[in-house]
């Protein structure tokens, strides 16, 4: 079976991959064997923002094609397609720190009702993502479940990681909500003090 058997769009996306990204995928497929391991070892290739974009685009094409009637009626092709898609997803899970990619992976887990995967993604969020990227997830996502996960993670970060976002107009409300959660659900006096100071500064500016 070749990549062309997956359909024209997937073949086109595959042909557009850089050689290093294709090699990374092939190596990851060989590592995972016949199983869809959630913990593919980090590939011995350079990973950059463009690889992020390439893998995300390929995963979107694979997931979209796998939901078509033609794919659903061909078990062998569907199985191979899902194997490649799971490999893309696992690489993105272990390597990416992008808000857009996190949303894509979390939405994929929700579609599959894969709540163990969603829990792993939540763990990755606290390990790999900056406060700004977590706030960007909250800003972009339309999913209440994903927003709740991101807010919970943001509220668990140190106050000095979240507080600077109060000065960014894109994230002011998000940061304030996360600090309120930290102050009242986690009894953080530091968060309460930051919020009190923020409210006082806002009052002076508006007064």
Locations of the language-model features?
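N-terminal "cap/leader" segments of large eukaryotic alpha-helical scaffolds
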Residues: 2-33
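Short, charged low-complexity linker/loop segments at the C-terminal edge of domains
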Residues: 187-189
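Terminal, low-structured helical/coil segments at or just beyond the last alpha-helical repeat
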Residues: 191-207
């Amino acid at each position: 079976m070749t990549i062309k058997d997956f359909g024209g769009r997937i073949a086109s996306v595959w042909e557009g991959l850089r050689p290093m990204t294709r090699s990374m995928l092939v190596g990851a497929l060989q590592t995972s064997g016949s199983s869809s391991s959630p913990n593919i070892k980090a590939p011995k290739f350079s990973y950059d923002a463009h690889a992020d974009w390439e893998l995300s685009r390929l995963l979107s094409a694979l997931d979209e094609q796998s939901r078509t009637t033609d794919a659903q009626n061909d078990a062998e092709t569907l199985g191979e397609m899902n194997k490649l898609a799971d490999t893309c997803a696992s690489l993105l899970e272990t390597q990416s720190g992008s808000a857009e990619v996190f949303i894509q992976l979390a939405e994929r887990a929700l579609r599959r009702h894969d709540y163990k995967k969603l829990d792993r993604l939540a763990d990755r969020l606290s390990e790999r993502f900056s406060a700004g990227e977590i706030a960007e997830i909250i800003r972009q996502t339309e999913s209440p479940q994903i927003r709740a996960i991101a807010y919970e993670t943001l509220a668990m970060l140190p106050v000095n990681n979240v507080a600077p976002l109060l000065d960014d107009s894109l994230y002011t409300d998000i940061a304030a909500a996360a600090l309120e959660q930290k102050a009242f659900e986690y009894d953080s006096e530091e968060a309460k003090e930051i919020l009190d100071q923020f409210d006082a500064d806002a009052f002076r500016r508006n007064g």
